[in-house]
């Protein structure tokens, strides 16, 4: 009997999911993306070669893995075809192993135009989106007016829906945001190319996944972003437009909850965040700069610098509860090498001195909170590329053990560098 494993980020994304998914695909026959879009970049480094995947599941770099983009993903045909051609240029056979749900909502040029226009209009109050049309595409989905992949293969239906939808969005673009309209005819012409390229790859993804399950194959579900970017459970409104928690597997891939065997939560040994929004443990001093430099903390898609801070156990506890996380994978432990003192946030304190053990539910409610830290000694030895727990410095092992004690959950994997082999596996999710 096969196992079904979910890998998701427990913080604000950028936790290193791509490398871990790629590593775990040695035991998987199927890898599935189930939410988000091409706003999330998963960075892989294999034999010194760096690859950034945005839409295509990380399992694509394993020759025997079938990859699915499920219905919970908002899909930009332009971005997908560009990514396919980039991988094919590097010798990866994509089209024979990639399948796309007919029910994926499409990201079209007017979504991108709206996204950028809104961010510009909001000025200093901007959310800090990637400007790739993700939010507006999900808005169309929820408003029940989205064009989906399946519509592309019915020309008259697609043209009629697009004409009506573009009238609406162009009105907003031109009249409210004072931006140029998106041209209907050029978009219709471009969509003809998408039809021919996508046709061999589309299917009913949910039905295919259940066939794989019945055949006893191992299935890996690859999450994008992180728990605190979830539209419902994140630091609203500084969130993404999709559900990033484990429940999104059920809706976003059509896969029943009782079939999930293991949930692996990915967390950095510290905390990072891109864009605006609350960040209780953020470091604005030389330590924060040092972590950012050593960790090369720049967004894989946007190149924007990431904000860096201490490990926040308050946030992690809630992530574990929300997602029934089975075990953790701690990444970038080596970035902390050489620090004299490490801190873990174990609670928050409000302006009246009250101690809070859980994070608030709205971004504004973080404003007056300060982290309550527990200090631990750092280590001077290198942890880079260590592959055995016993070879880690004593203080590094103590740091990890304390995280386990605070969170009440095991650390099953550790990443000590960007390469596949720079990993310590204590308990494999598929075992």
UniProtKB/Swiss-Prot annotation:
UniProt KW keywords: Cytoplasm, GTP-binding, Ligase, Magnesium, Metal-binding, Nucleotide-binding, Purine biosynthesis
Taxonomy, superkingdom: Bacteria
Annotated binding of Mg(2+), by residue: 14, 41
Family: Belongs to the adenylosuccinate synthetase family.
InterPro entries with a match to the protein in the record: Adenylosuccin_syn_GTP-bd, Adenylosuccin_syn_Lys_AS, Adenylosuccinate_synth_dom1, Adenylosuccinate_synth_dom2, Adenylosuccinate_synth_dom3, Adenylosuccinate_synthetase, P-loop_NTPase
A Gene Ontology BP annotation from the UniProt entry: 'de novo' AMP biosynthetic process
Compartment(s) of residence: Cytoplasm
Organism: Legionella pneumophila (strain Corby)
Pfam families in UniProt: Adenylsucc_synt (PF00709)
Enzymatic reactions: IMP + L-aspartate + GTP = N(6)-(1,2-dicarboxyethyl)-AMP + GDP + phosphate + 2 H(+)
Cofactors named for this entry: Mg(2+)
MF-aspect GO terms: adenylosuccinate synthase activity; GTP binding; magnesium ion binding
Protein name per its UniProtKB record: Adenylosuccinate synthetase
Role: Plays an important role in the de novo pathway of purine nucleotide biosynthesis. Catalyzes the first committed step in the biosynthesis of AMP from IMP.
A cellular component term, taken from the record's GO annotations: cytoplasm
Known pathway: Purine metabolism; AMP biosynthesis via de novo pathway; AMP from IMP: step 1/2
PROSITE patterns associated with the record: ADENYLOSUCCIN_SYN_1, ADENYLOSUCCIN_SYN_2
